[in-house]
A protein has these predicted regions:
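Transmembrane alpha-helical segments of multi-pass membrane proteins
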Residues: 8-12, 65-69, 75-95
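Alpha-helical transmembrane segments of multi-pass membrane proteins, especially transporters
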Residues: 6, 51-52, 80-88, 118, ...
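Canonical alpha-helical transmembrane segments
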Residues: 49-77
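Membrane-water interface at transmembrane helix exits
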Residues: 18, 22-25, 66-71, 96, ...
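Alpha-helical membrane-associated segments of multi-pass integral membrane proteins
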Residues: 6-10, 14, 104-151
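Alpha-helical transmembrane segments of multipass membrane proteins
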Residues: 13-17, 62, 88-96, 125, ...
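Interfacial non-cytosolic loop connecting adjacent transmembrane helices
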Residues: 27-49, 93-121
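N-terminal signal-anchor transmembrane alpha-helix
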Residues: 1-59
């Protein structure tokens, strides 16, 4: 029962992140990085929900791959978990940058520098969501449930 509560809390935190990423009044992305023209274009082109969804998918997908696809005794150490975290921290902003660049290019806009700065917070959110996902789903892994910290 305790493990199910962890999963529910993880899902709730992730949904809250998505809601705060898409809201009009308080957008978590705009609170951490604000550039008037850049943020206006991202909002008008409805890019925030897609960026949030990509970040969530990469973070939860990375955790699922580690705990259920890899799930090996040879890879149940904290540094293997940290390596997957590193992959998530690199992959999420790269995919989001490619999406940003494609949408802006299709609309005749160039925000290269702003996009790179913006993706630094994607690194932060991807890492936080990966940790949340890890603690939410690790309990059902047969070999890696003790990673990154023992129970």
């Amino acid at each position: 029962m305790k493990h199910l509560i962890y999963l529910i809390i993880g899902i709730a935190v992730t949904v809250l992140f998505f809601i705060l990423s898409c809201s009009d009044g308080f957008n978590i992305y705009e609170q951490l990085f604000f550039n008037q023209g850049f943020n206006d274009k991202m909002y008008n082109l409805s890019m925030y929900p897609v960026i949030a969804a990509i970040t969530i998918a990469v973070a939860w997908g990375g955790a699922a791959i580690y705990y259920y696809a890899i799930n090996s005794v040879k890879f149940d150490r904290w540094y293997h978990w940290l390596a997957v975290l590193g992959v998530v921290a690199v992959l999420a902003p790269v995919v989001c940058y490619i999406y940003n660049d494609t949408v802006f290019a299709n609309n005749g806009l160039m925000y290269v520098g702003e996009s790179i700065q913006f993706e630094m917070q994607t690194v932060l959110f991807a890492v936080l969501l990966y940790v949340v996902a890890s603690y939410s789903m690790r309990w059902w892994s047969s070999n890696c449930r003790h990673t990154p910290l023992p129970q």
